[in-house]
């Protein structure tokens, strides 16, 4: 809660206080605090404001030439003085978000053991499967409200990184705080170390994780179940976000737990919510509705299928039947268009196959319809890439789409930048500036024929911090599909292009606090409506959201007994 004017009673002093990131003020400790907390002589004489500290930190940051060094520097500040870290990041959010999260966090995960400085969060190894309660009791933060957990098997588009995947929960929770106002004292990153099948990690003498092939099957499922039960015993009201689990586990885990605990999967549901929000904004800018679109996906994994199901749900809410909506969505993977009768489809893919009657008149030289075949025959108006394979939105694909669609909506969403299906610069050139583009990673504006086209980053950070804020502010007990749909609609209402006819599809990151609060309000209202939180007035709800929103300012300290 926001109690910045009230003093905080601290049981630590001396080096112990300076070594506690949540409490350390560094050179901002007052004369009185230095005296009563045994800090005299441990700090330089000057007493600085947080603004002065932030100015120095930013100058130091600017001295680093490559993004990895900048990432390491910011993580060091986070592990030294969290209040200063969040003030610095919030002051330079557009510049620093790509450093603390995608795309730089991908390289940080790959090099996690090599750049390791200090532990953060919890590393729960399969070797300790019978001691999970003890490990949770060791967490530095004990008033935990939100957990981001990964098993490190599908880190962005980089695959199995073992415990290196810890960089993702750390980065995600940094955005919960920087964008959504969740106090860092209430956050906990966790990696479930069930081994790794990455030969590079296993052969690396620096690798710090459990050197063992990945645990799978019933042993894996039982381990996750034991973890969830332990979390429920220790923090029964905590929001659990599943992050970067492999396709074979992501959807089954979500289905197993979404009706048992307060949880969601950001790769599936968060990505779907921000994509639907961006699509709603794009449709409004193009003068149409989502239910009028024909949507093609390249990539039919759990993320792509999750987005597709969210799009279908929104189409149905606009008045068309479920069957009609599904006939307008085309899923393409490495084997071609998902069709009836294809072997080896996963359960969540089965509901998204195209029926034979819908493709019986299509023309193709191959029995399996390729992406270009889908462009020619289905004539889609929306193209979404979640394949993790660079360059697959070729000039032929985009121009074939543009032949029958004046303003194609093209979202190459794969992360990091090296995995993007096509660059915005190419898409804008190939469509002569007519395409509406959003990407998964940050890209600079595109200049074409004397015009500048800002590129929206279809970034989950526009969604999940607001969801977390709304859930925690009213103590919601579940995260439902309907709550996520409301987050999409709230995001679309913030689109500069949809509102003013100019600018990017999504608002600038400098407005992320107001966006997160708007999403939090919409999500919380739906939770109340569905009976997942106590009923309160709109005015009281807004007050709860405002009071819950943490700000990076130093509080006065008073000493209490050890």
UniProtKB/Swiss-Prot annotation:
Active site feature: 101, 172
Keyword NAD: yes
Site annotation Important for activity: residues: 267
Enzyme class: oxidoreductase
Cellular component annotations (GO), alphabetically ordered: cytosol
Keywords per UniProt: Metal-binding, NAD, Oxidoreductase
GO molecular function: malate dehydrogenase (decarboxylating) (NAD+) activity; metal ion binding; NAD binding; oxaloacetate decarboxylase activity
Co-factor: note: Divalent metal cations. Prefers magnesium or manganese.
UniProt catalytic activity: (S)-malate + NAD(+) = pyruvate + CO2 + NADH; oxaloacetate + H(+) = pyruvate + CO2
Positions that bind a divalent metal cation: 243-244, 267
Superkingdom per UniProt: Bacteria
Needed cofactors: Mg(2+); Mn(2+)
Binding site for NAD(+): 154, 267, 415
Coiled-coil region(s): none
SUPFAM superfamilies referenced in this protein's UniProt entry, alphabetically: Aminoacid dehydrogenase-like, N-terminal domain, NAD(P)-binding Rossmann-fold domains
GO biological process, one term: malate metabolic process
InterPro entries: Aminoacid_DH-like_N_sf, Malic_enzyme_CS, Malic_N_dom, Malic_N_dom_sf, Malic_NAD-bd, Malic_OxRdtase, NAD(P)-bd_dom_sf, NAD_malic_enz_proteobac
Gene3D superfamilies for the chain: Malic enzyme, N-terminal domain, NAD(P)-binding Rossmann-like Domain
PROSITE patterns: MALIC_ENZYMES
Family annotation (PANTHER family): MALIC ENZYME-RELATED, NAD-DEPENDENT MALIC ENZYME, MITOCHONDRIAL
HAMAP family: NAD_malic_enz
Family from the record: Belongs to the malic enzymes family.
Assembly with partners or alone: Homotetramer.
Annotated protein name in UniProt: NAD-dependent malic enzyme
Origin species: Aliivibrio fischeri (strain ATCC 700601 / ES114) (Vibrio fischeri)
């Amino acid at each position: 809660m926001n109690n910045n004017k009230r003093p905080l009673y601290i049981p630590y002093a001396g080096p112990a206080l300076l070594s506690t990131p949540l409490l350390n003020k560094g050179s901002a400790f007052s004369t009185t605090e230095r005296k009563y907390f045994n800090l005299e002589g441990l700090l330089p004489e000057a007493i600085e404001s947080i603004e002065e500290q932030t100015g120095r930190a930013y100058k130091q940051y600017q001295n680093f030439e490559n993004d990895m060094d900048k990432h390491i520097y910011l993580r060091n500040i986070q592990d030294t003085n969290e209040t200063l870290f969040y003030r610095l990041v919030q002051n330079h959010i557009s510049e620093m978000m790509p450093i603390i999260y995608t795309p730089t966090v991908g390289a940080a995960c790959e090099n996690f053991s090599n750049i390791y400085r200090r532990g953060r969060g919890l590393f729960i190894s399969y070797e300790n499967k019978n001691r999970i309660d003890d490990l949770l009791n060791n967490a530095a933060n004990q008033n935990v409200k939100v957990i981001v957990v990964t098993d490190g098997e599908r880190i962005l588009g980089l695959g199995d990184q073992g415990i290196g995947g810890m960089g993702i929960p750390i980065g995600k929770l940094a955005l919960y705080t920087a964008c959504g106002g969740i106090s860092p004292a209430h956050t906990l990153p966790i990696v479930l170390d069930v081994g790794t099948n990455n030969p590079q990690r296993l052969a690396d003498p620096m690798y710090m994780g459990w050197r063992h092939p990945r645990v799978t099957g019933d042993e894996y499922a039982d381990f996750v179940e034991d973890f969830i039960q332990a979390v429920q015993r220790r923090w029964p009201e905590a929001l659990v976000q599943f992050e970067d689990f492999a396709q074979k586990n992501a959807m089954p885990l979500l289905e197993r737990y979404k009706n048992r605990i307060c949880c969601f999967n950001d790769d599936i549901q968060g990505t779907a919510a921000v994509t639907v929000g961006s699509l709603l904004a794009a449709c409004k800018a193009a003068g149409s509705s989502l239910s009028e679109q024909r949507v093609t996906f390249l990539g039919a994994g759990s993320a792509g299928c999750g987005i597709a199901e969210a799009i279908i749900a929104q189409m149905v809410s606009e008045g068309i039947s479920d069957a009609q909506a599904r006939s307008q969505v085309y899923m393409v993977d490495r084997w071609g268009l998902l069709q009836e009768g294809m072997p080896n489809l996963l359960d969540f893919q089965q509901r998204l196959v195209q029926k034979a009657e819908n493709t019986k008149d299509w023309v193709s030289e191959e029995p399996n319809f390729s992406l270009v075949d889908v462009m020619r025959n289905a004539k889609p108006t929306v193209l979404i890439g979640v394949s993790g394979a660079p360059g697959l939105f070729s000039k032929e694909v985009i121009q074939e789409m543009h032949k029958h669609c004046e303003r194609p909506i093209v979202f190459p969403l794969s992360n990091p930048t090296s995995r993007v299906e096509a660059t915005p610069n190419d898409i804008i050139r190939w469509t002569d500036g007519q395409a509406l583009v959003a990407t998964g990673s940050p890209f600079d504006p595109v200049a074409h024929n004397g015009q500048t086209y800002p590129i929206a980053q279809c970034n989950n950070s526009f969604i999940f911090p607001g969801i977390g804020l709304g859930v925690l502010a009213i103590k919601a007990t579940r995260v439902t599909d309907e709550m996520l749909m409301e987050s999409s609609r709230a995001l679309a209402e913030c689109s500069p292009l949809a509102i003013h006819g100019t600018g990017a599809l999504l608002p600038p990151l400098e407005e992320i606090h107001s966006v997160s609060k708007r999403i939090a309000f919409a999500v919380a209202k739906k939770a109340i409506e569905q009976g997942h939180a106590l009923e309160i007035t709109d005015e009281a709800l807004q007050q709860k959201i405002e009071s819950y929103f943490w700000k990076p300012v130093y509080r006065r300290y008073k000493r209490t007994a050890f």
